[in-house]
Curated annotation (Swiss-Prot):
GO process terms (BP): terpenoid biosynthetic process
Active site per database record: Y189 (proton acceptor), Y189 (proton donor)
Similarity comment text for this entry: Belongs to the short-chain dehydrogenases/reductases (SDR) family.
EC number(s) stated in the UniProt entry for this protein: 1.1.1.-
Name of this protein: Short chain dehydrogenase ausX
Species name: Emericella nidulans (strain FGSC A4 / ATCC 38163 / CBS 112.46 / NRRL 194 / M139) (Aspergillus nidulans)
UniProt xrefs under Gene3D superfamilies: NAD(P)-binding Rossmann-like Domain
SUPFAM superfamilies, alphabetized: NAD(P)-binding Rossmann-fold domains
Binding residues for NADP(+): I49, D95, R157, Y189
Enzyme class: oxidoreductase
Entries under Pfam families matching the protein: adh_short
Length: 197
């Protein structure tokens, strides 16, 4: 597994696109049960990408489609028409804070593309309104943790058995550099965005 950190804060699509091109040439090895990991996109690879309606998720989906991949895009908001109309893009609307959403995402991918998942890009994320610990509501805490941390873990749990059957697959978990520095505000976001080992 490889973790991309530091990039969620960028808002420029050109910077995001440049960042996402890193995926094209990256080779990473995995220590988990001979599961090979490669970020070399080839035509017809099937990818699940969360957060495809804006930001890094949109840039990653656009790049993957340009490379010939088939993408199941997941977001709570509908994607831009330019993405939605692409022949190799299928949108699945889901609120990743709901406990059953990750399983439904993988079921939708299987219905659309069969029992093949070559990659999972966990990019969707939410902020916590920069609330400090003494003003943080339970709802904001739970939403940040469920979308930024729990949903990616559940999605990995769903796709790894499929990847093991094929003997290969790639997982990218996008984290934030905010998790590596302390601050008075942003407690839930910081806790939920720590890069995983």
């Amino acid at each position: 597994m490889f973790i991309i950190s530091q990039y969620r804060e960028h808002r420029s699509l050109s910077i995001l696109t440049q960042t996402c091109t890193i995926f094209r040439s990256m080779q990473v090895s995995s220590k988990h049960e001979n599961l090979s990991v490669s970020f070399h996109l080839t035509p017809l690879q099937v990818l699940i990408i969360t957060g495809t309606s804006s930001g890094i998720g949109l840039a990653a989906a656009t790049m993957a489609l340009e490379e010939g991949a088939k993408v199941l895009g997941v977001d709570i908001s509908k994607p831009p028409d330019s993405l939605a109309r692409h022949a190799n893009y299928q949108f699945f609307q889901a609120d990743l804070s709901h406990p059953e959403a990750p399983a439904r995402v993988v079921e939708a991918c299987s219905r659309t593309y069969g029992d093949r998942i070559d990659g999972l890009l966990n990019i969707a994320g939410v902020m916590d309104l920069n609330q400090s610990a003494d003003s943080l509501s339970d709802n904001v805490w739970e939403r940040c943790i469920s979308i930024n941390l729990t949903a990616p873990v559940k999605l990995m749990r769903e796709v790894i058995p499929i990847m093991k059957l094929r003997g290969k697959g790639s997982i990218v978990n996008v984290a934030s550099k905010a998790a590596l520095s302390g601050a008075v505000s942003g407690v839930a976001y910081t806790a939920s965005e720590h890069p995983w080992p």
